[in-house]
Swiss-Prot record:
Family the UniProt entry places it in: Belongs to the cullin family.
Name listed for the protein in its UniProt record: Cullin-like protein 5
Any single GO BP term: ubiquitin-dependent protein catabolic process
GO molecular function: ubiquitin protein ligase binding
SUPFAM superfamilies: Cullin repeat-like (SSF74788)
PANTHER family (alphabetical): CULLIN (PTHR11932)
Disordered: annotated segments: 1-34
Species of origin: Arabidopsis thaliana (Mouse-ear cress)
Length: 434
């Protein structure tokens, strides 16, 4: 399958041109070359290499000339690296090859790496180490450049687009390195993964830059939550958050600041909403918030998806638990007026955070508060009928709540027929007939 990759439109670097040659094209004197993007046509997909010679006969070596397997593997690896190393340099430096001369086909590099690594994980590890050693100075230089360009700027709209462009350019280059190295994997990691780890290593050695980027990301997230974000913020955020994808073990790097920022934001916003809302409007606000945050998780906003369970706990804490007295009073009002949509919404919200037991507790309190008066007035059955209707329509026929309703009313002396009790009665009747 041919794969076409366009140069990054945001990159500030000048991309070399892609030139195809026929087999008769010889030296193609005066033409610039760049790394090809297809593996299927070795006559068209060529990469310039300084002082390249005719492709060495690395696939037709006489077995008798190399008797020792270890020496043969070393020879394969050395020849593969002779081809791969200059290719990596061209990719990372975005070099344009302007000197006339021979070209070395991409597929030749591809096959050489395959021959060197075939069936021997130790050889793959050596290739990985060589590539890491070749790439790390370039990545260190990239981080130093970002430090220099971003220092002294606290405005995310100024420095984050620059970081974004350089990150996209880095992703493009490391993807090409992985391509030309035959998509080698080691312990489940690709060369792209290795490149990203090196990026994080160098970024962690520049803590001021790292904190600056994370702070900028959090400010963009806040703007997006407030509806102030520009149209392109979503793509910008997703790519910037992906910079930290391989740092999943270092929760203090991005998770803790993200969750702290989220907690502070919703604590303040919930207070503002409560000042101008009744129970119905507040429940709608909480539902919109839950759905918006879950949507970001589903759309692979990395900070959100990697912190999903903790994020939902923060929302539960700041939007529900922190205002439990308000919600309990509101629940009583909703039950009194049988506001089905709001009761259904309230149950759904607490179910989303696995807190059905909270609904169970306030439902029990409601029945006990209303039941004594209903018994004295002789309207206990009417109260049960009303609550049972709400249970069917709003509470998903939750078994826990059903048991609570049954226990409370039976405590007031009202017999509550049900499927389970009716089945026992039917069994008892059969036993009496026998």
């Amino acid at each position: 399958m041919k794969r076409s990759i366009s140069p990054d439109p945001f990159s500030s670097t000048k991309s070399p041109k892609l030139v195809h040659h026929s087999p008769d094209d010889g030296g193609a004197e005066g033409n610039p070359y760049r790394l090809p993007f297809t593996l299927s046509d070795e006559n068209l997909s060529c990469l310039p290499i300084s002082q390249a010679r005719e492709p060495p006969p690395i696939f037709n070596l006489d077995p008798n000339s190399v008797k020792d397997t270890q020496d043969r593997n070393k020879l394969y690896l050395a020849k593969a690296w002779d081809l791969l190393k200059p290719a990596i340099k061209i990719i990372l430096d975005d070099d344009e090859y302007k000197k006339p001369g021979d070209v070395l086909c991409f597929t030749t590099i591809f096959r050489a790496v395959k021959r060197a690594c075939l069936g021997d994980p130790r050889q793959s590890e050596l290739v990985f180490n060589l590539v890491k050693h070749e790439c790390e100075p370039h990545i260190a230089e990239l981080i130093q450049s970002l430090e220099k360009n971003c220092s002294g700027s606290d405005d995310p709209s100024v420095f984050l687009p620059h970081v974004y462009n350089r990150w996209l350019d880095f992703k493009r280059k490391m993807s090409l390195v992985s391509d030309v190295a035959m998509y080698q994997t080691l312990n489940g990691l690709t060369l792209w993964d290795v490149g990203q780890k090196l990026f994080h290593k160098q970024l962690s050695m520049a803590p001021q830059l790292q904190d600056q980027v994370i702070t900028g990301i959090l400010r963009l997230i806040t703007d997006e939550r407030l509806g102030k974000a520009a149209n392109n913020t979503s793509d910008l955020l997703k790519n910037l958050m992906d910079m930290f994808r391989m740092q999943w073990q270092c929760t203090y790097v991005y998770k803790d600041p993200f969750l702290d920022s989220t907690s502070k934001f919703y604590a303040e916003e919930a207070e503002q909403v409560l000042q101008r809302s009744d129970i119905s409007h507040y429940l709608k606000y909480v539902e919109r918030t839950f759905l918006a945050e879950e949507e970001k998780c589903d759309k692979h906003y990395f900070f959100f998806s990697s912190s999903r369970s903790r994020l939902m706990k923060v929302l539960k804490s700041q939007l529900l638990e922190a205002h439990s007295s308000f919600l309990e009073e509101g629940f009583m009002l909703l039950m009194d007026e049988s506001l089905i949509d709001d009761l259904r919404r309230m149950y759904r919200l607490f179910s989303m955070v696995d807190s059905e037991d909270y609904i169970d507790r306030i439902l029990r309190a409601y029945i006990l508060a209303k039941g004594e008066g209903a018994r004295q007035e002789g309207s206990l059955q009417e109260l049960h009928t009303s609550i049972d209707k709400i249970w069917h329509q709003c509470f998903g026929q939750d078994d826990l709540l059903d048991k609570t309703i049954r226990d409370c009313f039976e405590g007031f002396g009202l017999h509550v027929p049900g499927e389970f009790s009716d089945q026992l009665q039917w069994i008892d009747d059969d036993d009496d007939e026998d």
